[in-house]
Amino acid sequence: MAKRYLLDFEKPLVELEKQIEQIKELARDSEVDVSQQLLQLETLAARRREEIFKSLTPAQKIQVARHPQRPSTLDFVQMFCDDWIELHGDRNGGDDMALVGGIGSINNRPVLILGHQKGRDTKENVVRNFGMAKPGGYRKALRLMQHADRFSLPILTFIDTPGAYAGLTAEEQGQGEAIARNLREMFGLKVPIVATVIGEGGSGGALGIGVADRLLMFEHSVYTVASPEACASILWRDAAKAPEAASALKITGKDLLKLGIIDEVLPEPSGGNNWAPLDAGNTLKEAIEKHLNALLQMTKDELIEERYKKFRVLGKFIEANNIEEIYSEIPQKTE
């Protein structure tokens, strides 16, 4: 098993993790029974981890969402998708590796799956462009979604990107147009669409595959109009104020559910999805099945109408003296 990568605020666990690894090595190299000591240490580590993660700040949740060992789109595909066939190309000469898509089945139900894909290390991240899709990626996604619409396949999208690639070549190739076209076309698709923020949901890069009938988020995922670092640089000319920006942006699942932006917050294992990926996969699979079953009861016209209404109420201007007054104006959803 790969060595666990601990975040800054997990430092209280470092010594415990070292002791656990030492005991495991001792068990492998000798016949000494250390099961009792190992159980005690793992129980203590789990308890401390739970204490840390139940009170994370928005800035700390961003660190969890960006964790290099957090399950990715292709990880989840391997966990619960059968007969997976990845489809390539935008039919315009490109095949963006930062946004993957293909056809598979979940419990014998054919579906189209799209998602941003980050790498595990520097080499993979260069290939995947750190999960930042270029125009060709969004055009590939649209081609596959239109394919799904033609053959009546439900669409599942997994969002995990700091944002769409903002390089010169992306602008020259029409990044804004590609994302805008996806937004327009997704409103007219006649099949159910369930989007899930599995890690980082950043700006237009997330929206490019985020127009959905149901928008879900993992507990420690984030969904934001701009990265806190970018926001702090714009508002205060100081990227060091990113933690303050993270709090002000309301980027967590709890805040976004309260604001009516998302439809459900999915719980994560203690320590985040990277500590128990299979548990995270089971949680995601169950949520997808629940929402797909409900959406498949609706007619095509009802799907389109409800999807339009869902997004039409976003951005409503409300005058208020404080944020709690704004919350009171919004229909509340329960977790």
From Swiss-Prot:
Chemical reaction(s) catalysed: N(6)-carboxybiotinyl-L-lysyl-[protein] + acetyl-CoA = N(6)-biotinyl-L-lysyl-[protein] + malonyl-CoA
Residue pairs linked by disulfide bridges in the UniProt entry: none
Coiled coil segments of this chain: none
Record EC number: 2.1.3.15
GO molecular function, one term: ATP binding
GO BP annotations listed: fatty acid biosynthetic process; malonyl-CoA biosynthetic process
Described purpose of this protein according to its UniProt entry: Component of the acetyl coenzyme A carboxylase (ACC) complex. First, biotin carboxylase catalyzes the carboxylation of biotin on its carrier protein (BCCP) and then the CO(2) group is transferred by the carboxyltransferase to acetyl-CoA to form malonyl-CoA.
Protein name stated in the entry: Acetyl-coenzyme A carboxylase carboxyl transferase subunit alpha
Organism the protein comes from: Prochlorococcus marinus (strain MIT 9215)
Gene from which this protein is expressed: accA
